[in-house]
UniProtKB/Swiss-Prot annotation:
Keywords: Ribonucleoprotein, Ribosomal protein, RNA-binding, rRNA-binding, tRNA-binding. Transmembrane segments: none annotated. GO terms for biological process: translation. Residues 7-17 have a biased composition (Basic residues). It comes from Coxiella burnetii (strain CbuK_Q154). This is Large ribosomal subunit protein uL16. Binds 23S rRNA and is also seen to make contacts with the A and possibly P site tRNAs. Part of the 50S ribosomal subunit. Belongs to the universal ribosomal protein uL16 family.
């Protein structure tokens, strides 16, 4: 599972996930990409499940690049504990994703295989995604 190795502070404020992605919104490392079309918090487990799905579908061919990293800790207090007494412990890690952000990229496979792999991976993620091809500038 992906998570930061060390941080200055263990816990974060909740924050808000708004706006559109101004960075990481182009296919940079591969030929095809899976692009987010809405805001979401993607957990490290969801990201790993989607990555495994892509890897299984494309088998030995191709290279997968993960363009997001779960670097935000989400805390939770234990069940049946009263409010107060400080913030809960870190339960899992998420990546905040805005519309337009590239999540995965693939290179070295044909378009039909990449499209099918991304469709299966998108089913594991909590947001709507779009299949995109690299545009040469």
């Amino acid at each position: 599972m992906l998570q930061p190795s060390n941080r200055k502070y263990r816990k974060d404020f909740k924050g808000r996930n708004r706006g559109v992605a101004s960075r990481g919104n182009r296919v940079s490392f591969g030929e095809f990409g899976l692009k987010a079309t809405e805001c979401a918090r993607i957990t490290a487990r969801q990201l790993e499940a989607a990555r495994r799905t892509i890897a299984r579908h494309i088998k030995r061919g191709g290279k997968i690049t993960i363009r997001i990293f779960p670097d935000k800790p989400i805390t939770k207090k234990p069940l049946e504990v009263r409010q107060g007494k400080g913030k809960g412990s870190v339960e899992y890690w998420v990546a905040l994703v805005q519309p337009g952000r590239m999540i995965f990229e693939i290179e070295g496979v044909d378009e039909a295989l990449a499209r099918e792999a991304f469709n299966r991976a998108a089913a594991k993620l909590p947001l709507k995604c779009l299949f995109v091809k690299r545009t040469v500038m």
